[in-house]
Design a protein with these regions (language model features):
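Conserved nucleotide-sugar donor-interacting segment of glycosyltransferase catalytic cores
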Residues: 1
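Donor nucleotide-sugar binding/catalytic pocket of nucleotide-sugar-dependent glycosyltransferases
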Residues: 5-59
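Short gly/ser/thr-rich secondary-structure transition/capping motifs
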Residues: 7-10, 126-127, 152
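Conserved catalytic-core segment of nucleotide-activated headgroup transferases in glycan assembly
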Residues: 12-13, 21, 46-140
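Acidic donor-binding loop of glycosyltransferase active sites
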Residues: 24, 139-156, 164
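Glycine-rich, N-terminal phosphate-binding loop of Rossmann-like dinucleotide-binding domains
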Residues: 30, 77, 148
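Short glycine-rich, flexible loops that bind phosphorylated cofactors or substrates
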Residues: 35, 82, 152-153
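Donor-sugar nucleotide-binding helix/loop cap in glycosyltransferases
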Residues: 161
Length: 164
C-alpha cells in the first residue's frame, strides 16, 4: 500500500507541475504553502492571504448576554464537502453525547447538506441548509466549533468566527 501511495504521489506531483505552465498567474495563501510547490517558477507565485470582510463579520453591539438555559454551538460550511460532512457527523455522534446538559444545542449551517448531514437533525441539532447571512449565525452562537479532521489549508470559517 505504501508503494502505491508513493507512486501515485509522484504522478500527482508531475501532473501538478505540468499544469502550472498552462496558467499566466498563480496565487497561494501563504509563503509556507508556496515553499511546498515543487516547480522551478514557484517564487513567482503571488501570495494573497485569506481574510474576511470586516463590514460583514463584526461583533454585534446589541448581542444579548448568553442565555444560561440554552447554549448555542455552531459549525458552518458547505455540507456536501467531505471534510465538513465528517466534522458534522463527528460533532453529533461523538461530541454531543458527551455534553450531558440538555440545554446545549448545535446548529449545522451551510448549503447543500448531504443526506448524512440532514439525518443528524434532532431536538438538539438544527440543520439549516443555505442561510442568507452566515454572519448572523455566528452572532447568534455562544461558541463556534470546527472539528475538522480532514482537509487542508486555512479555514475561512475560523477567521469569520473570530471576527464575529
Amino acid at each position: 500500500m505504501r508503494w502505491i501511495m508513493m507512486v501515485e504521489g509522484n504522478r500527482l506531483a508531475r501532473y501538478e507541475s505540468r499544469m502550472f505552465d498552462y496558467f499566466d498567474a498563480h496565487t497561494i495563501i501563504s509563503k509556507n504553502d508556496r515553499l511546498l510547490i515543487p516547480h522551478r517558477d514557484r517564487d513567482g507565485i503571488h501570495i494573497v492571504p485569506n481574510g474576511v470582510e470586516l463590514e460583514q463579520f463584526t461583533p454585534s453591539d446589541t448581542k444579548a448576554p448568553p442565555n444560561p438555559s440554552k447554549r448555542a454551538l455552531l459549525f458552518t460550511g458547505n455540507m456536501s464537502y467531505a471534510p465538513n460532512v465528517d466534522a458534522a457527523q463527528f460533532l453529533v455522534e461523538e461530541i454531543m453525547p458527551l455534553l450531558q446538559t440538555p440545554n446545549v444545542h448545535l446548529t449545522l449551517a451551510g448549503a447543500q447538506p448531504k443526506a448524512q448531514v440532514s439525518a443528524l437533525a434532532s431536538e438538539r441539532v438544527h440543520v439549516t441548509g443555505w442561510v442568507d447571512d452566515i454572519a448572523d449565525e455566528y452572532r447568534k452562537a455562544d461558541l463556534f466549533v470546527a472539528p475538522l479532521r480532514m482537509g487542508t489549508g486555512l479555514q475561512n470559517k475560523v477567521l469569520e468566527a473570530m471576527s464575529s
